[in-house]
């Protein structure tokens, strides 16, 4: 038995070394425990316990809490920077200058209402201002389309990761059904999928007694429950200036507007 335990420990060490660069992998550890004595009371030596993961639940929970905030600030900062560029006055031809010259042309016309050059200047500055508004509108529309495109990509990623977690729930539950084995690598893969989810949206998760993880996004919408995965759908709605709205679709096609989760 001692030889068997040592052999298993060596295999586990090799597994740890082989996966040191695997994203989400947790180091594994073989523990030995006292074997039950025989009927005469003679000790049975040692037995290997199920291989466990060296894993800190507190650290994992903090990662899930902080990751979406980091992603939100990064994304928001990126788009605010693009909006700032659209409204920029650094090149001397921004909206502020166009407005000033437009009102100045009207002021000159009010002082010389019969002047043909003054009238022409009003027309020229009106055209310049209108052109500036059209250009800004086009840029903002392009930015809106970029945001919608990213939201569509995010929806697809969330759905794929939710499906992955549900499938791993099923596999883990099947593997650990007898209570004698722990699906360490599958659990690592599931944790990594949930961590990847946290980069896209605010996530909370908890594990039930059967080893299956429930995943909640936002404050209270269930994405994964046991072996079941629900999904997100994006669609355009009127009155939203062309912005994509996101629905959570659960059992019996029950829908809930989750757009705020991705805009907060």
Mark where each language-model region is.
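Structural signature of extracellular appendage/secretion-system components
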Residues: 1-264
